[in-house]
UniProtKB/Swiss-Prot annotation:
Gene this chain is encoded by: nagB
Pathway membership: Amino-sugar metabolism; N-acetylneuraminate degradation; D-fructose 6-phosphate from N-acetylneuraminate: step 5/5
Entry EC number(s): 3.5.99.6
Protein name as catalogued: Glucosamine-6-phosphate deaminase
Keyword Repressor tagged: no
One Gene Ontology cellular component annotation held by this UniProt entry: cytoplasm
Database matches in HAMAP family: GlcN6P_deamin
CDD domains associated with the record: GlcN6P_deaminase
Role, per record: Catalyzes the reversible isomerization-deamination of glucosamine 6-phosphate (GlcN6P) to form fructose 6-phosphate (Fru6P) and ammonium ion.
GO BP annotations, alphabetical order: carbohydrate metabolic process; glucosamine catabolic process; N-acetylglucosamine catabolic process; N-acetylneuraminate catabolic process
Source organism (scientific name): Salmonella typhimurium (strain LT2 / SGSC1412 / ATCC 700720)
Signal peptide residues on this chain, from the entry's feature table: none
Keywords: Allosteric enzyme, Carbohydrate metabolism, Hydrolase
Location of the active site: D72, D141, H143, E148
Gene3D superfamilies in the cross-refs: 3.40.50.1360
Length: 266
């Protein structure tokens, strides 16, 4: 696992965006051989999306031959709702870049057959071979996507019941009213994430410090879903300074020295 320790949330977003752009451009995608990118929602990736849009407008990257798969979606929330992940992605990213509509894949939380929707999502991912890079965030309790504590580390795309803590955390997007936050969501599984060629998780804020410590220094444990990254051959964790508060000094020193060339100048 790589740990990229930076100072601010803005630096995390810019580093992540640059990494994505470098991967896409090195891949040299075509219509017949697209780059497959996994994407998250929420507050954490907003600076990364802003930076990606800016780099696209500057001519540094095209998303014309990029196929995207989003991590999750609420169940029962109309896709036109301002807090649906469909709306979030179009508002913050898709509407500002040159990605073709047919290359965008979002789970349908209003599908008449939820099980079939999840199965077809997995099949579509497999039809492209694999996701080349999956970007994600992490919850205070260590969940990635909506794989809440005690999720199977071999799980696939499915419906999940959201914990009360997750709904409280997400209520900031629903006028602070937890009762407006859906109780269920569709989410890619931990196994789905681990199948990606590379996984990049962004960690911001002191409230995520315990989750980061569990990911980097703890044991692989289904109660801390983020610890699954230890099983991945190419995992990258990009974090700001407040989120590192629970890490041992020697751990942080080790990664600062290891990644010195990759973080200088930020």
């Amino acid at each position: 696992m790589r740990l990229i320790p930076l100072s601010t949330a803005e630096q995390v977003g810019k580093w992540a965006a640059r990494h994505i752009v470098n991967r896409i451009n090195a891949f040299k995608p075509t219509a017949d051989r697209p780059f497959v990118l996994g994407l998250p929602t929420g507050g954490t990736p907003l600076t990364a999306y802003k930076a990606l849009v800016e780099m696209h407008k500057a001519g540094e990257v095209s998303f014309k031959h990029v196929v995207t798969f989003n991590m999750d979606e609420y169940v029962g929330l109309p896709k036109e709702h301002p807090e649906s992940y469909h709306s979030f992605m179009h508002r913050n990213f898709f509407d500002h870049v040159d990605i073709p509509a047919e290359n965008i894949n979002l789970l349908n939380g209003n599908a008449p057959d939820i099980d079939a929707e999840c199965r077809q999502y997995e099949e579509k991912i497999r039809s492209y071979g694999k996701i080349h890079l999956f970007m994600g965030g992490v919850g205070n309790d260590g969940h990635i996507a909506f794989n809440e504590p005690a999720s199977s580390l071999a799980s696939r795309t499915r419906i999940k019941t959201l914990t009360h803590d997750t709904r409280v955390a997400n209520s900031r997007f629903f006028d602070g009213d937890v009762n407006q936050v859906p109780k269920y969501a569709l989410t890619v599984g931990v196994g789905t994430l681990l199948d990606a060629e590379e996984v990049m998780i962004l960690v911001l804020g002191h409230q995520k410090a315990q989750a980061l410590q569990a990911a980097v220094e703890g044991n692989v444990n289904h109660m801390w879903t983020i610890s699954c990254l230890q099983l991945h051959p190419k995992a990258v964790v990009v974090c700001d300074e407040p989120s590192t508060m629970e890490l041992k000094v020697k751990t942080l020193k080790y990664f600062n020295e290891l990644e010195a060339e990759n973080i200088k100048g930020l």
